Structures are given as C-alpha cells and as structure tokens.
Amino acid sequence: MGKYFGTDGFRGEANENLTADHAYKIGRFLGWYYGEQKRRNGDDTPARIVIGKDTRRSSYMFEYTLVGGLVASGADAYLLHVTTTPSVAYVARTDNFDCGIMISASHNPYYDNGIKLINGNGEKMDEETIALVEDYLDGKVEVFGETYEEVPYAHKDRIGCTVDYVAGRNRYVGYLISLGMYSFKGVKVGLDCANGSAWNIAKAVFDALGAKTYVINAEPDGTNINNNAGSTHIEGLQKLVVEKGLDVGFAYDGDADRCLCVDEKGNVITGDHILYIYGCYMKERGKLLTNTVVTTVMSNFGLYKAFDEQGIGYAKTAVGDKYVYEYMAKNGCRIGGEQSGHIIFSKYASTGDGILTSLKMMEVMLAKKMPMSELAAPLKIYPQVLENVRVTDKKAAQSDSDVQKAVAAVTEKLGDTGRILVRESGTEPVIRVMVEAPDQEICQKYVDEVVNVICEKGYKA
C-alpha cells in the first residue's frame, strides 16, 4: 500500500481525504504517461482511457475533473457513465484501452468516494505505476529515466477528446447474457442493487435470460447508495425472498464487484459458500484446474475443513481480490475470492464481478437441479466474531508488543479448535480483530481480550 492508494484504490471522504484536485492530477499524469509511453514506442496516437462511475453525488465531480486532467494532457477520455467496476475492466481489456478508471468507494457510504485504476489487461493496476501516480500527487515527476518539472500540457489539436462510450457498457451487458448456459425461465430471483452501479444492469441481464425478477434498491438519488441496502445490509433481500417465496436472491455492493446470495429459506450465502459450491461443481466436472480454490486469510475455518473432505486443495492470500487474482494468474487457477463476496472466475473475468457471480450460482442450481440451501449445506461455518477498531495509527497498533502478546495468548488457548487473525484494513484506519471457534461466546471473549489491549494502549481513535 502507498501513501494514497490502498488495496482497492485511492479512497476517502469526498473533498476531505480525496479531492477534486487529486482527481485532476491523476488524470493529468495518466493522460500524459500513457501517451508518452506510446510515443516512445513509435505510436503517435493519443492515449485512450475509459472511465466508469457509480451513483454517488460526488462521482460526477470526480468524473469531470479526471476528464479535465486527461484531455489537458492529450488523452482521449471514453465515458461509460454509471456502470460497474468489472465492466470497466472488461471494456479496458476487450477494446484495447491503455487503462481504465472506476470512480467508486465500493460498499462505503455515499459521502466517501474512490478512484480505482485498471490496466489495459483489465487487471488492478501494478504497484509501479501507482507509485508514479503518487509521486506526481506529491509534486515529483521521475519517469522514463528522466526528471520533469511538470507534466506537459497538450496544445492545439493535441488536446484530447471526450467520447460518449455507453456502447461499451452495453457490450458488457451482452457479454454477461452470453454466459447464461441455461434458461432462467420459471425461476423467481430477487436482486438488491444497493442503489449503486448494478441498478441499470443486473435486472436487464436476468430478464434477458428469462427469470422472473424482483428488484429492490434500484432507485439511486446520489446519497442512498449502500444505505441499508446491498451486500453489507442483506436483511432487506432476506425479507424479500421469504415474503415473495423466491427461489434465490443476490445482493451487490455499490460498484457491483461483489455478490452475496440468499437461499430460498432466507439464509445468507457468503463468499465462502460460493467458493465451496462452485469449487465442488468444477471438480465434479473435471474442470477445477490445479485442483485449487484460492481464498484469503479471512475465509472461514470451516471452509478449509469442507475442502479437505472433498479432496479440494486451497491457497490463502492477503485480503484483496487483487492478490487473489495475482495468485490465480500465476498458478493457473480458475476460481478464487473473498468471504465478502469478491469472487473471480478467471476464465471469464480479471476482477471480482458480482453479476457474473450470480449467473454462475444460477448455473450450478440449474445444472444440479438443487436449491441453494442444499448446495451450501455441507459447508459448516464456524462461529466468527469480527470487530473493526478505528485507530490513530494502525501500523503501530498492529506491531505493539502487548497487542502481539495478547494475540499469542489467544492463539495458544484456541489450539487447533479455531484461530485468531488481527490485521490492518487496506482501505481504512482500522484494525480488524477476528476469532473463529466452535462457540460464539468463546469468539467474543477472545476478541474482547485483544480489543481491550488495543484500547488500553491508547490506539483507539
């Protein structure tokens, strides 16, 4: 992680930690950098950069300032308008863009926003390029073996163009529809669009495949994104599924790069369940390449026991679908993801894609002719307590010797009956303390022991 960019982009409260000036400078640098890179390789055409945004009020402000920076540096800016993060990755990859930018703070409240950078292969941006962007934000331009006083402006006909590119978003919708292996006719599906990016995409896909679709939280007003809605507030979808007698429900977050499910009984199906269900489905069909499902350190203890019972191997990465994808690409794995619902199907996408995930869960249900509750039943989730402690200095809190002693003491007490994980958030000034054990009370007790030490040492904000 850098000074500005965390595991999922540059994120903060709009016009506090993340300002319009930041966005303009990011546009200025990227527009020049990719254009100069092309010129040095004998290509005199302008850089082409595609931009998407979610439904936050501030997303429009950041879009306009990013575009201003891009075209001032000579790049052409292609606007997908309100769309999902995975659609930006798809369009960047398939339409040969130099890079993509998504304006979103994902599951955060409306007053936050973020800038996510995506390379021309549709993958999260590499650390080297992000470091160059951060240097420019701090007034330093050292690139291509040279030092510049400032990124040069484009002039006359070298000033970039702005292109309405809603056609790119529409092609992404068509791509999702093309992945439907079965007709959804007769299946009653609930969708919670979080008043975010999925609001004008998810229903179109499910309707095209024949589902009887019931939608909630698809009326964005700029301030209601993720407000008691979507994958972080799934109780509304649970109620809808039960009251309407639906077969399944899917909840997305603000930029629709994650998905959680609700089975026909109203139970929540987490990202760990999805990894288990699809991993078993792939193994049964002989398509689980390397016989490995990629998880993160936050996946439930019970998931690994279930994989062991099924003879499925697994890998653990740091938290962040960026790290999951890097491992998958390096090792040839087909399925990986996070408990939170960021799931990557590497045959079809290079990032987590919530709508794609829901289509794949529909595929398993229809192929096996089983309800979601039965597909998920073999996975026994261990009780888990996770507490997010907002701190003044997360690195100091994490490395404090007394905190580490408290963690070691809990680890010893749990033995092989559970685990404790204490880590820094990649996107917030937060320490996450998580315990899994056979009993909820034990989990809470051990979480409290560690959190109390963090507070006693004065780290709590």
Over which residues does each language-model region extend?
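An N-terminal, well-structured beta->alpha segment
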Residues: 1-68, 72-73, 162-187, 395-399
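General beta-strand structural signal in soluble alpha/beta enzymes
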Residues: 5-6, 51, 77-82, 102-103, ...
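Buried hydrophobic positions in well-ordered alpha/beta secondary-structure cores of metabolic enzymes
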Residues: 8, 51, 88, 101, ...
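Gly/Ser/Thr-enriched, mixed-charge loops and adjacent short helices
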Residues: 13, 113-244
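N-terminal small/polar loop signature for handling phosphorylated ligands or for N-terminal nucleophile
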Residues: 40, 48-112, 204-262
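Gly/Ser/Thr-rich active-site loops/lids in small-molecule metabolic enzymes
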Residues: 124-126, 215, 267-286, 354-364, ...
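Proline/glycine-rich low-complexity loops and linkers
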Residues: 131-173, 178, 264-337, 344-345
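Phosphate-binding and adjacent anionic-ligand microenvironments
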Residues: 248, 285-461
